[in-house]
Structures are given as structure tokens and as C-alpha cells.
Amino acid sequence: LKNDKMKKSILILCVLLMAAIPSACTESHKTPPELDKPQPGPNPDPKPEPSEGKEKMLWFDAEANFQRFSTQAGIIAMLDKTQEAGFNKIVVDVKPVEGDVLYKSEFMTQATTIGSVNVADRGWDYLQFFLDEAHKRNLKVTVSTTVFPMGMPSTRQGPAYRGTTWKGKTCMQYKPEGMVDIKDDPTKVAAFLNPVLPEVQEFALRFIREIVTNYDFDAYALDYCRFPDYQSDFSEASKEAFEKYIGGLVETWPGDVFTYNASGERVPGKYYKEWWEFRSMIIHDFVARVRKEIKAIKPDVKLEYWAASWWGALYANGQNWASKAFRPLTDQDAWSFNSWCSINYHQTGFADQLDTFLLGTYLPRVYGPDDGESIEYGINRAERFLLNACTYYATVDCSQKTFDIEEACYYCLKRTAGLMVFDIVHVINNDMWAAIKRGIDRYEAEAATE
């Protein structure tokens, strides 16, 4: 669903040009930065997984498909094609970064405008219709929401720009030119609320509880459950929370975290490493709260979380999806973590809070054990970092026509417990239905003989 803007490529530029709507692949779902450069290392042999029960998921992004899924006929047609292609589960996005929702809520506003696309009040429950039609086709359903975004700075749309409810609660960015509220920064894809604030967390838990209570589905996926990037949040509230975390006063704010040099590069301060640990612990603790809330309402609903596979860049977003048992500073790639990783950073790992981690191997090549931009490399790394703390599925982006989606689907199913393809808009635009089916069928035929 989010990043630190080291990975600024927008995955579905073609959708913007063709449909003049916001990109399906917003900050949360995008291509990797140059940061993760592998050193030569061992080449783990692929470990076959049992085929029974493996989930093959297709993501239905709310923004990129806003017009397409404005009618029931449009939804039905795509669910039929999804089933025919071999998928057995869908992900339905019901809270895009714009902040309004696509389910029946007692306190959230219905999404009728995203970017330049306007959809009249449907008069029917978008999420319930998806659920009813998916169940008719024996498709499982994951419901996904962005967690902390509440508006789009590029268009100034969303709850963050209406009224005063969220005044002073969106992230305060520390940039080379000074402090800038994220909702006033059109370069950012989403106006994030500050995850540090208790009232923000309570609000997010409220809509999560509402969805889990009122709908019958299989899993809940957290998207954009993170900080926007390294520039956020530097509000007074975050300063006070950080001081409580370290048990002392920060004399120079924000300079004791970092400053900028003349080139706009970060220069670490004395609390640099502790700062990233603090922010990751905020996200860890929130994910743990979400799990507790969901399981208290419906114990069988699984908690899922999507994040990019390039773990070494995600400290800037507070996303430590690794196991607590993983020790970054003794890993083979420790050389690339030393500059920011504290001795206790491993304690912020939240893999053990998840039922399923959706590993964002949104990478251009399938094979290459020493290629940091290959799915194989991303899966090998995840095995080291997750240490069986949770089930995980490899997930792929098929926005590029030249991407070998057939081989990617086959390999992801062979190596991990499941598959997620992002996003249906790419599958449609690139006509990848047949190739996906070939990849799924090849894996299942092979697995049936093992």
C-alpha cells in the first residue's frame, strides 16, 4: 500500500496517461531504491512448499479502478476473469490514500471523487457487493485499507483538507528548507496523520473495528501502516514522545536527530539511531494493537501486512517486518545497516504479530541470487529476516509489459506459501490473464506430482 522517497518510480504511469486518475501504485507499492546492493553470498536452494491451500491473490486497488468498479457489472466481469485465471483470493481496497471509504460506515465519508474521477453515489455497498460476488465464485477475500493517509496533497482532496478535525495532526516534515506540513507538500503522495498521536491510532482502530465487526471476510491487510518517509514526524508531540522513549531531554531539536549539509544530505546527530528505533517501535506497537483488536472480534480473521522487500531502506518508514530473532548487525548485509541500526532495533520487529506477511518483491527480474533487483534475491533475504515468525507470500508488480509474469507466478508459488499480483489494472492493460494462468497451472501440475 508505503516511501522514504529513495524509490520514487510510479508503477502505473500508463494508468495516469490513459485514465487521468491517481496511480494505483502509490507510495506503498513501488519499485526499489538503489540502496540494497548485495554482496556475493550463498545461494540457498529453493524449498518446495506443499501446494494444498496455497492462496493466489489479485489486488483490486481503489484508486486506479475507481471508474471501472463504479458499476456492479464492471465488478462481476473482472471477478469472472480473476477466477478463470486461477486466482482463489482477492484483495479489496476500501480506503485509498485520499482518505474516504468504499464501505458502509457510520463515521467515515463515502468516496465519490478521487483525482479527476467522479462517481455518483452508488446506492449500494461496494464492499458487500464484492464479498457477495466473490463468495459466489469461491474466492476468499482480504479487505485492505490504508491506515494513516487522510488526503492527497497533489489535489488537496480528502478529510485532512475538510474542516478542522485533523488540524495539527498531519505529519510535520523536517526538510532542508525547514518545517513543512505534509498536507501542504504537493510532492508527497499522501497526507499522513502522525502515527505517534494516540488519537490518530484510536481513529484507525475505530475503522478497523467497524469493518471487522460488520463484514464477513477472511483477512485484513494493513497498507500504509507506517511513517511517510525519513522527513516525518518532527512535531512537538513526537519530540515529547521520543524524550519519554529515551528517558531524557533532547537539547537541540531536531539537530540531535540529524541536520542537513549544504547538499541537502542528512548528517547524523547523537540520537540518530535511537530515533529510527523509536519510530519503528511506534509501528510495532500499533500492529500489535490491531492484532489484539481483530482477534477479539473475530479470531479467524487473519492479519496481513504489505511492505516492500528492500528491508534496509524501510527504517525511514518505521517498517521492521523482520522477526525479533533476526539480528541485523550480525547479518551478512550488516555493512549496509550499521549507519542507522541501533543495538536494540531488532526488538521492533513485528513479524510475530502477523498471520501473513505480503512480501513486496516488486522487482524487474525473477532469477538472480546475487541480483538485488530479482525476486529470487528478495525471497532469499526474507527467509533470513523472517525466520519462520509468520507465513509469507511473495508479491509481484506487473506494470511493465515486458515483465515475465508467467515465470514470476510460478516461482513465487514454488518458493513461498502463496502469491499476490498487483494490480488488476496492470493485468487488464497488459493483457496478462493467460500468462498468469500458465504460471499458476505449471506450478500446481508440478506440485501435484511431488
Residue ranges and their predicted role:
Residues 151-153, 230, 297, 302-367, ...:
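Substrate-binding cleft/loops of secretory-pathway carbohydrate-active enzymes
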Residues 102-114, 149-186, 224-263, 316-329:
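Aromatic- and acidic-residue-enriched segments that line the glycan-binding/catalytic groove
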Residues 87-122:
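Aromatic-lined carbohydrate-binding/catalytic grooves of carbohydrate-active enzymes
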Residues 50-69, 142-214, 261-272:
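Active-site-adjacent "subsite" loops/lids of carbohydrate-active enzymes
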Residues 20-52:
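Bacterial Sec-dependent N-terminal signal peptides
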Residues 337-450:
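Substrate-binding cleft of secreted/luminal carbohydrate-active enzymes
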Residues 87-94, 126-184, 221-226, 299-304:
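Glycine-rich, aromatic-flanked loop segments that form ligand/cofactor-binding clefts
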Residues 73-100, 215, 346-357, 415-418:
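Catalytic domains of carbohydrate-active enzymes, especially glycoside hydrolases
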